[in-house]
A protein has these predicted regions:
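Hydrophobic alpha-helical bundle cores within soluble ligand-binding/oligomerization subdomains
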Residues: 1-266
């Protein structure tokens, strides 16, 4: 403590230096607008507008995926039970899926719902965690060892790996929560397998509830929430962390784990 207190005399950087040398304080400019870190055609978050005098003004929030408003997606979609699946297809491939496209894509997700054999017992139940974000990091990193070629960064193969990770997210999150509540909350441990006939939202609700029950309204609400959180562009800390880490040509599991670490911060 003594050394730490004294060290403060040698570590402070005057705020005026940031302006003098044009250094950004985090991912914000001085006027509180976002720092431009790259270009994307995937997602666009509109949280403010610039008036005629160049001042930043708060605006009604808008979110676009591939140029399509999420409000329009929710209101016009024919796939009432698979909004998240439809949105993730759009984000990954750049266009809205046909009914046949969505069916094939959803089937691919369903193929990856379940965790590898022994994963639940060895990586989740044996080592329950106090924080779900840390557990999710560990879970993602552990999946690396179940991949036959985890360090292959070919674009197409990375896409396939990413879809498989997406498919397993409900199981990773829900089982980590169940283990935490059992070990730290002293609650009964009841586990449900993901069901192939369920969507991502439906499986999350089913796996979290002791009796596995949920209403259509609950499933639809969670489906919309998943859609809204599917992508927020490149200006968030978690996405930025992924951009930095993946630029080293590391494996996908390490990149995603770094994003989760950044996302955990308040």
């Amino acid at each position: 403590a003594q050394f730490y207190g004294k060290s403060q005399n040698y570590t402070q950087i005057p705020r005026k230096w940031y302006k003098k040398y044009g250094v950004k304080r985090g991912l914000r400019n001085e006027d509180k607008t976002g720092v431009l870190i790259g270009l994307t055609r995937i997602a666009d978050v509109v949280g403010y507008k610039i008036d005629d005098e160049g001042r930043k003004c708060d605006a009604e929030g808008e979110l676009y995926y591939r140029g399509i408003s999420v409000e329009d997606m929710v209101s016009s979609s024919k796939n009432v039970k698979n909004l998240y699946e439809e949105a993730s297809f759009l984000l990954l491939f750049g266009y809205l899926p046909t009914e046949a496209d969505l069916h094939k894509y959803s089937a691919r997700l369903k193929d990856g719902y379940e965790l590898p054999g022994g994963f639940l017992e060895n990586h989740i139940l044996r080592y329950p965690g106090k924080n779900l974000m840390n557990q999710l990091q560990l879970g993602i990193l552990a999946l690396y060892n179940y991949d036959k070629n985890p360090d292959d960064t070919d674009v197409y193969k990375t896409l396939v790996k990413g879809i498989d990770i997406m498919a397993k997210m409900p199981s990773l999150v829900c089982y980590a929560y169940n283990a935490k509540q059992h070990y730290y909350g002293r609650e009964s441990l009841v586990l449900h397998y993901p069901k192939r006939e369920y969507s991502t939202a439906e499986n999350i609700l089913s796996m979290l509830r002791l009796d596995g029950s949920f209403t259509e309204e609950e499933a639809h609400l969670l489906d919309v929430m998943l859609l809204l959180h599917a992508d927020h562009g490149g200006g968030t800390n978690s996405t930025f962390a992924n951009v930095v880490v993946s630029s080293t040509d590391t494996d996908l599991y390490s990149s995603i784990a770094s994003s989760i670490g950044a996302l955990k911060g308040p």
